Design a protein with these regions (language model features):
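Intrinsic structural disorder
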Residues: 1, 21, 178, 258-259
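Domain-level signal for Mg2+-assisted phosphodiester chemistry and nucleotide/NA-binding surfaces
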Residues: 1-94
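Extended two-metal-dependent nuclease catalytic cores across DNA- and RNA-processing enzymes
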Residues: 28-30, 55-56, 79-258
Length: 259
């Protein structure tokens, strides 16, 4: 088993912590960074994760590409996240490339690259605190607990996120519908694309609105990626797509906790 690690946030956090402001007075404030501190902090975080599984467990580090395919779907996607990367960010990644296997896939965020790899090579464990990764079937360690996500619960979580949206990423879902409300809707009406469309239309939104939100919410799997063209295949559900018939407990997409 390999650990598939969302390394974006680890390196970002480590580099940000290594920054120092130097105030020269007047209008001059300079930001400096200690590369050794940033790299050491990153290594410590990776060691801490590895120690949860055994010191010889192989790691693969995933980073986001500088181009994001979701911006072609919605130009405003993550538009408010305009803060530059902290000092040393690229240099730390370049150093990590000499120490670990690093994967950056064209146009994909780290989440998507992990989703594609995990479903192409089952039996590994994704390591990420991001709730989006509950879409991907298989083992997931969220830095607190380890879960096994079923294919059905992952598919349900995708539709739940389609309705609930993600304001931090810049797509709104259905106004007034959060995760809990989405779970209730699917429990009552069945977890299906038909239910998604009905819920969007009840708020005066369109099928196109629903599809845009679903495509933004979806974490890619191997089925969603064209390996020859090296680009994602946008999710296009059939009109009768469904996860379950509304029997109840299957709707809540959390997964089974591993002992």
């Amino acid at each position: 088993m390999k650990l598939l690690i969302d390394a974006d946030f680890i390196v970002y956090k480590s580099c940000a912590a290594a920054e120092t402001e130097v105030d020269f007075g007047s209008d001059v404030i300079l930001v400096t960074s200690n590369f050794s501190d940033a790299l050491s902090a990153t290594r410590r975080e990776l060691t801490k994760i590895r120690d949860q599984f055994g010191s010889f467990t192989p790691l693969i580090l995933f980073f986001s590409d500088t181009v994001n395919f979701r911006k072609k779907i919605l130009p405003e996607y993550k538009g408010h996240r305009n803060r530059k990367k902290p000092c040393g960010y690229k240099r730390v990644i370049n150093q990590l490339k000499t120490e670990f296997e690093v994967i950056i896939m064209p146009e994909l965020e780290a989440d998507d690259a992990m989703g594609v790899y995990a479903t192409q090579h089952p039996g590994n464990c994704i390591v990420s605190p991001d709730k989006d990764m509950k879409q991907i079937p298989g083992k997931l360690y969220n830095l607190d607990e380890q879960f096994t996500v079923s294919k059905e619960s992952g598919a349900a979580w995708h539709l739940i996120q389609t309705l609930a949206g993600d304001q931090t990423d810049g797509y709104g879902g259905v106004p007034g519908v959060g995760v809990k409300r989405a779970e209730t809707i699917f429990k009552e009406k069945g977890c299906s694309w038909k239910t998604v469309l009905e819920t969007f239309k009840e708020k005066g939104l369109t099928e196109e609105d629903a599809l845009v939100n679903a495509r933004l919410a979806r974490i890619l799997t191997a089925d969603d990626y064209d390996f020859n063209k090296k680009q994602p295949k946008l999710w296009s559900p059939s009109s009768d797509y469904k996860v379950n018939d509304g029997s109840g407990s299957k709707v809540k997409a959390v997964g089974t906790k591993n002992k």
